[in-house]
Structures are given as C-alpha cells and as structure tokens.
Amino acid sequence: MSKILIIEDEETIRRVLNKVLTQENKTYSIVEAVDGVDGISKINSSKFDLILCDIKMPKKDGIEVLKHILKECPNTPTIMISGHGDLETAVESMRLGAFDYISKPPDLNRLLNSVRSALLNNNFVKRGKVKNNKSKEFNI
C-alpha cells in the first residue's frame, strides 16, 4: 500500500485528486492537508511514499513546504502542482529537487503517469537500487 499526502488549499482540487488517485489504485492510502502548515504537520508526524503539493497556498507556500520535505524526508518524491503555470516557479521547484511539476487543471493521464513513476522510483530507492534523486546514480 502506498501512502500519499495531498497538500492543496482548494477543497475542490483536493477532492478531485483524492478521487482520481483512489480510482486509479484502491490500495493508495490518501491523506489530505488543507495548507502548507497542515502539510508540514502531517509530514512531521507520519511517513509518506509520495507527496502532491500545491505551490500557491496561504500561510506557507509550496516552495517552503518542498524545502521542508527535502530536509526532513529527502527520499520522498514530491510532485508540485500549480494553477499559476509560470516557468520560473516550475524551474525553481525542479531545481530544488521536486520529482515533477504539473500545471492546473492537471491532465489526469499525465498526473497518473507521474504518480506511478514517482512511486516506482521511491520503491527502487527503498530497495537500495537507486541512491537518491539528487545523485542520479543508478544501480539497475
């Protein structure tokens, strides 16, 4: 079972992401956070196999949350999602270490492919077959 955290301040988007992921794979355990502060609290109290994180949120934005994730759980892949599809933010999040960046409204096939890839990569990391996202050393 894969445990996925969705950090999204827009309830409608959060619910859609939850529903799409649950329909994709009934074994996904989905946890929701309503903003960056709530997301960090959940990250600090539980381990996740994947995190989906909005960028523009009140209290703490997604870039701040991503930095926290990379510090506290660097091998947890994070997919950044934003309705403000500006290239600068996408580049910054990828440069920092996000697994992927997806614009809202998300193309559901692209989102699901990214989720599958991130979880597969995470399984390789857990098994020690890939050192981590940053080193780019593959032992496959």
Predicted regions and their residues:
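Acidic, metal-coordinating helix/loop segments flanking the phosphotransfer/catalytic sites
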Residues: 32-50
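C-terminal output helix
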Residues: 86, 106-116
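Conserved acidic carboxylate
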Residues: 8
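Acidic catalytic/metal-coordinating carboxylates
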Residues: 35-38, 61-64, 82
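Short amphipathic alpha-helix used as the core "switch/output" element in two-component signaling
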Residues: 41, 63-75, 92
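Receiver (REC) domain active-site loop signature in two-component systems and cognate sites
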Residues: 57
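Two-component/phosphorelay signaling modules centered on CheY-like receiver
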Residues: 11-31
